[in-house]
Amino acid sequence: MSISYNVFDIAVNPTYYSFEKLKLIVEKAKELKILPLFIGLDMETNIQVIHLSKMQQTLCYCGIHPTHINTLYKENNIWNILDIVQADLKQLFVENSEYIIAIGECGLDYYRNQLKIEQQRIFKMQLELSYLNIPYFLHMRNAFDDFYNIIKNYTNVTGVIHSFDGTVDQALALINLGFYIGINGCSLKNNIDLVKNIPIDKILVETDSPFCLIRKSYAGAEYGKVLKVKENEPVYILNLIEIISNIKQMPIQQLIHQFKLNTIKCFPQLKKFQ
């Protein structure tokens, strides 16, 4: 995997595609020097994305997504298995360190899942693995206050808050803690203020394929081409970067170069693709 890439799509959900479709979209992306990075969502999909990363010659993240915590427990037994799940995650990282570049996707989601206490416990359990010196691929939706109050206590945790749809002030507060902000089509749904106002050296770009296309009704749509496709895929990250360049009034190639540097700083294992 020593090929050089120009763009890293930091968020691709491979388990939502058939194997044949995944193979096709990865090949298309790599032809354009785009490397898709795969997301694990729970213990089952973590195993799958490691396997798919090996098959597709890419890298991945492994963790427990806040909306997938129901896969960990029946009734109220979650408190009895946190140590077991933490140990299982650690074993995954140790045994597959060549392919796993971050812990995640993990975080808090109060939009789709109201099990707030359970989410917080599972989030903290994963943050306690920071002694492994692995970056984090983080999720935060409708949960800024609790997310911030938890994450600020883990001063050795680094990484990106992906698919960011919060406010400019929230983004800047997280940037001040040392985090990067992941931008995709959903970040441009209601307004362009976020993209317009956060520094380019703190932005990572993503498609969150097959989700988060920029739709005609989105605020960001007037700054570029709206793709007439049903599903997102990694090659469309170039469309996202073009829209960001129009919003920020900066050359596309300058942004591509900066976003590549940012991603490598966030995930040092990507240095092999410089």
Curated annotation (Swiss-Prot):
GO terms for cellular component: cytosol; nucleus. It is an enzyme of class 3 (hydrolase). A divalent metal cation 2 binds at E105, H139, H162. The keyword Repeat does not apply. Keywords: Hydrolase, Metal-binding, Nuclease, Nucleus. Its cofactor is a divalent metal cation. Binds 2 divalent metal cations per subunit. GO terms for molecular function: 3'-5'-DNA exonuclease activity; metal ion binding. A divalent metal cation 1 binds at E105, D208. InterPro entries: DNase_TatD-rel_CS, Metal_Hydrolase, TatD-like, TatD-type_Hydrolase. Pfam families: TatD_DNase (PF01026). Putative deoxyribonuclease. This is Putative deoxyribonuclease TATDN1 homolog.
